[in-house]
Amino acid sequence: MVLTEVYRNVDDIPNIGSYHIETAMVKSDDLMKNILRVKTDHGNEYGIRLDNEDQILENGSAFKLGDKQLLVLSVIADEMIEITPRDINEMGLVAHFLGNLHKPVQIKDGKISLLLDKVVIKMLDKHDINYELKKVQLDQPLEYLDLTK
């Protein structure tokens, strides 16, 4: 079966308990794809091909399989670096370095998050920049900064 449209996010579905749910585990970078093949916890395989280019996949994207049946995407947790710069100068240094490495990042609440990378860890340690390693389940894929939007 090929699924072409996201029904809604599982968190936004009323009476979710009345549905039979199959879950497919996906990597965070799979969320950027318009065409995807998944295998569920029930052993079923489905193809996903989004017809609408404006639709995006995210953690919890649900597809209708039947009247009371859903396929829900669940993102596998990634090992992430979460950087907390002390001031604007440190933020600039980190942003410059990550930009030169062409790393996709997520910036939220004054913190920069990116996938685990040993080169980045060495740079952060060398410059005594605060960071934590965390296992994070991303809601949306990390993206490269796009100044055209």
UniProtKB/Swiss-Prot annotation:
InterPro entries linked to this entry: UreE, UreE_C_dom, UreE_N, UreE_N_sf
Major localization class: cytoplasm
Keywords annotated in UniProt: Chaperone, Cytoplasm, Nickel, Nickel insertion
Gene Ontology cellular-component terms listed: cytoplasm
Subcellular location: Cytoplasm
One Pfam short name: UreE_C
GO BP, sorted A to Z: protein folding; protein-containing complex assembly; urea metabolic process
SUPFAM superfamilies, per database record: Urease metallochaperone UreE, C-terminal domain, Urease metallochaperone UreE, N-terminal domain
Keyword Cytoplasm in annotation: yes
Gene Ontology molecular function, alphabetical: nickel cation binding; unfolded protein binding
Family affiliation: Belongs to the UreE family.
Annotated function: Involved in urease metallocenter assembly. Binds nickel. Probably functions as a nickel donor during metallocenter assembly.
Name of the protein in question: Urease accessory protein UreE
Organism: Limosilactobacillus fermentum
